[in-house]
Regions:
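Sec-dependent bacterial lipoprotein signal peptides
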Residues: 1-16
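Cyclophilin-like peptidyl-prolyl cis-trans isomerases
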Residues: 6-7, 18-264
Length: 264
């Protein structure tokens, strides 16, 4: 895992699709596209920005890791996911993941998630939902068919930040590989303390400490983290503990009744 975060941030390489817990996602081959000078310049600028942010996250004692506070800051949004098992309150991070947050909030406002089931649940790993088809193969971003610059048809791009991690309670976009974000999302639920496995020259000290409470550090760098549970982890644990059948689908449907936007 050494240097995995920095390498992932700078190269934007996804680790695995959330369609499998530990195995890799098979991607279809395609001819490489020619990059323009503008694209190359933009990517270089973005990589440099990430390097600077990563250095700040690793060396600045006052670096801000918003997941570590339950307070909702002025530049954060707040929502409540009302499920058939109880309510989950989260704060969202538009500063660090603007596309994912806008996509989520727009879908929520339009009722896209109303009645959608948690189609994949693995105790001590995560709970996944957001697919109107209910089988893990559906769901689209708000830009599909409307803005090819953001969503070419396969989903919108991953957003990486050295200030956000797959800690216990972290809200993240599910994907089937690099830049394939649609509407599906998951909440990290693992309670295992993996902090001792994390290299101190790769993970910020505050994040290593936070991982003592659980989470999935192996997913860092492969998925867009865009929110954090601030109330209702007992509900997340309850959903995670439900009896499942084929493909980790709960035997009794657990649904999102609606998503209430408390603060944008």
């Amino acid at each position: 895992m050494k240097k995995i975060i920095l390498l992932s941030l700078l190269s934007a390489l996804a680790l695995t699709g959330c369609s499998a817990k530990e195995d890799s996602t098979t991607k279809s081959s395609s001819a490489p596209k020619q990059s323009s000078a503008t694209d190359t310049s933009s990517e270089a600028a973005e990589a440099q920005k990430l390097r600077e942010q990563y250095k700040d996250a690793m060396t600045n004692e006052n670096a801000n890791f918003p997941q570590l506070s339950k307070e909702v800051a002025e530049d954060e949004a707040e929502v409540k996911i009302i499920t058939t098992q109880g309510d989950i309150r989260l704060k969202l991070f538009p500063k660090y993941a603007p596309l994912a947050v806008e996509n989520f909030l727009t879908h929520a406002k339009e009722g896209y998630y109303d009645g959608v089931i948690f189609h994949r649940v693995i105790n001590d790993f995560m709970i996944q939902t957001g697919d109107p088809k209910g089988d893990g193969t559906g769901g689209e971003s708000i830009w599909k068919g409307k803005n090819e610059a953001i969503d070419s048809g396969n989903g919108f791009k991953n957003e990486y930040s050295p200030y956000l991690y797959n800690l216990r309670g972290a809200l993240a976009m599910a994907n089937a590989g690099k830049d394939t974000n649609g509407s599906q999302f998951f909440i990290n639920q693992s309670k295992k303390d993996l902090s001792k496995q994390l290299p101190t020259d790769t993970f910020p000290a505050k994040i290593i400490e936070a991982y003592k409470n659980g989470g999935n550090p192996s997913l860092d760098g492969g998925y867009t983290v865009f929110g954090q549970v601030i109330e209702g982890m007992d509900v997340v644990d309850k959903i995670a503990a439900t009896e499942t059948g084929d493909k980790d689908k709960p035997k009794t449907d657990i649904k999102i009744e609606k998503i209430e936007i408390i603060k944008e």
